[in-house]
Amino acid sequence: MGERQTIADSKRAFHQAFPHVIAPLYRRLADELLVELHLLSHQSSFKTTPLFAVGLCTVFDTFSAGYRPEEHITGLLDALCSSNGYDANTFRKESKRCIDAAKTESVDAMDSHLAGQKLGEGSHYSRLMAIGVLRLFEEAKGDADQPDEADLRKRCKELSTALNFPAERVEKDLSLFASNSERMSAAIELVQETIAAERRKKERRQAEQAQRSES
């Protein structure tokens, strides 16, 4: 994207690429990622990395869970990326490649597995990179079916120096991601329960109307 691209330009391009109403529950996701990608696109020392791709796709998938209509989800990420000069399909492919590779590694082997992902000197760090590291730790083979998230976040922080990530920011970014994910999951569950309750009420009313019609 050119240096003159403003956030207003990015928003305009986004709405042209995705001319659909976004439910309030998901509007924050769209707004925050749009602004985040816009700012990164203008950061001269920022370069996309495989870990960034994993983190971006993880954040998007986490906070778009339950989105309806489901067929709009791919287009939403496409528009968020394209409006800022990025390609969502490239990120998706890179993310899948990294996750597939992580699944063949043990959790203890991930430090050496990720050694080649060190951020270059002077390169701009993004929270999405740290989230990408966490996701790969989650995908690695472990002894437990459900890995301890706090332990994995600790491992990510310990690895941050080797990856040339700011350790304190990594800890803060991962903690915030965890708390926001929990809140989003609870909100989605509440919405789904409300929809299910409304559906049951509607079905009861229809059944009662049918009984009255027959009597």
Curated annotation (Swiss-Prot):
Q: Name one GO cellular component term.
A: plasma membrane-derived thylakoid photosystem II
Asked whether the UniProt record includes Transmembrane helix among its keywords, one would answer no
User: InterPro entries from the xrefs?
Assistant: Thf1 (IPR017499)
Pfam assignment, any one:
ThylakoidFormat
Positions in coiled-coil regions: 188-209
Q: What keywords would UniProt list here?
A: Coiled coil
Q: Per its UniProt record, what HAMAP family does this chain match?
A: Thf1
Similarity comment: family membership: Belongs to the THF1 family.
Give a short account of what the protein does: May be involved in photosynthetic membrane biogenesis.
Q: What is this protein called?
A: Protein Thf1
Q: According to the entry, what is the taxonomic lineage of the organism?
A: Bacteria, Bacillati, Cyanobacteriota, Cyanophyceae, Synechococcales
This chain is encoded by the gene named thf1
